[in-house]
Design a protein with these regions (language model features):
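Fe-S-dependent hydro-lyases/dehydratases of central metabolism
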Residues: 1-434
């Protein structure tokens, strides 16, 4: 529900939040009533972040415990945490070894009222991760590579389970990034097993120590613990990826699975002008009314650090901040035709960016906070400057958007921005400067 109406200033966040409340006041009042009226219904306040990122950072337990009855005798039960959500990227939590996926509103409401969710037992694809990640390679590069491979394989309606020695190289935020994009690679979910990284994340995110010990003990007793010694699990089929082969990448201009190696993006865009956008000429330099600059095919009109996919990952967010710091100290500035925005999936992101001293450099480049929630990747990028959109429309310019989101389908990001590329947050900053 967050729209990037205002951007590029310190007041943008407050202005967008005020508009969000104005547009959604009836919804929020209804949810508040629900929280007061039902014992088993809790509401995370508006402006807190994206539901599945909040679930990863605060709520999920991996192994759940509660009181129950066996043969009319009250006992304490332990069982794996599971979740269904009305956002397709609910799958993100599989990175923390919690089985979950997106469902429709009616299914979710039925589950809230105690009804079971039925499903056909799915095929399971085993995806082996091996090798080590090279320096400079991000979780975004990795997930775009995995998305490309799994789309080619065909995993619609199937579970994907990741295994192998290479998992030791992946933090929980890295795994969550991969699990998040399950809808884009077509799977019902992309699941990671419980291991020491799981325990480490539960500890650093402030989970209850007793609950953490339960996770470890339960997983080992039930055979759910990943020790990397051998994998005798039976899968429908298997795939493999060597982390050392991953290259810096983007995906676009219209689909998340269309990965392009960074060094070839310019050449591929020029090809797409003719093949995808039916342009006869590779250049159409056009003056922007009322401004002292011109725009052409390929100019980046939107640069958005956005969505749960990447803002949940501190390594790429800090990377974006460090790049902004270096650029600001060199006196570099964002191009005047670029609409910049920072919309994290939770308040934790701005907390560590501010405490580390990096937020001020992002601000200098125009990446001010615009809100906490889904924005550009669901089409809530907000309007471009009128003179810029008029120039694009009048001259049929194929301009670009670069976003750290998970979807870039044509017409989704902005009606005037036809070529959209998924990229890591550091690359979003770089393209805003280019």
């Amino acid at each position: 529900s967050v729209m990037v109406d205002k951007f590029g200033s310190a007041s943008a966040h407050k202005a967008n939040v005020d508009l969000e409340y104005k547009r959604n006041i009836e919804r929020y009042e209804f949810l508040r009533w629900g929280q007061k009226s039902f014992d088993n219904f809790r509401v995370v306040p508006p402006g807190t972040g994206i539901c599945h990122q909040v679930n990863l950072e605060y709520l999920a337990k991996t192994i759940w415990s509660s009181s129950g009855f066996i043969n009319n005798k009250k006992v304490e039960l332990a069982y794996p945490d599971t979740v269904v959500g009305t956002d397709s990227h609910t799958t993100m939590i599989n990175g923390l070894s919690v089985l979950g996926w997106g469902v429709g509103g009616i299914e979710a409401e039925a589950a809230m009222l105690g009804q079971p969710i039925s499903m056909v037992v799915p095929e399971v694809i085993g995806f082996e991760i091996k090798g080590k990640i090279k320096e400079g390679i991000t979780a975004t590069d990795l997930v775009l590579t995995i998305t490309e491979q799994l789309r080619k394989k065909g995993v619609v309606g199937k579970f994907v389970e990741f295994f192998g020695e290479g998992l030791k190289e992946l933090s929980i935020p890295d795994r969550a990034t991969i699990s998040n994009m399950a809808p884009e690679y077509g799977a019902t979910c992309g699941f990671f097993p419980i291991d020491e990284e799981t325990i480490k994340f539960l500890k650093v995110s402030g989970r209850d120590e007793k609950g953490i010990q339960l996770v470890k003990k339960y997983a080992k007793l039930q055979g759910l613990w990943e020790d990397y010694k051998k994998n005798d699990r039976v899968y429908t089929d298997k795939m493999q990826l060597d982390l050392s082969q991953i290259l810096p990448s983007l995906a676009g201009p219209k689909r998340p699975q269309d990965k392009i190696v960074l060094s070839k993006v310019s050449d591929e865009f020029l090809k797409s002008l003719k093949s995808e956008f039916s342009q006869k000429n590779i250049s159409n330099l056009s003056k922007v009314k009322g401004e002292n600059f011109e725009m052409d095919h390929g100019h980046v009109a939107i640069a958005a650090i956005t969505s749960c996919t990447n803002t949940s990952n501190p390594s790429v967010m800090v990377g974006a901040g460090l790049l902004a710091k270096k650029a600001a100290k060199l006196g570099l500035k964002t191009k005047p035709w670029v609409k910049t925005s920072l919309a994290p999936g939770s308040k934790i992101v701005t907390d560590y960016l501010t405490k580390s001293g990096l937020q001020k450099y992002l601000d200098k480049l125009g990446f001010h906070l615009v809100g906490f929630g889904c924005t550009t990747c669901i089409g809530n990028s907000g309007p471009l400057d009128k003179n810029i959109s008029d120039t694009i429309g009048k001259n049929n310019l194929i301009v670009s958007g670069v976003l750290s989101g998970n979807r870039n389908f044509e017409g989704r990001i902005n009606p005037f921005v036809k070529a959209n590329y998924l990229a890591s947050p550091p690359l979003v900053v770089a393209y805003a400067l280019a």
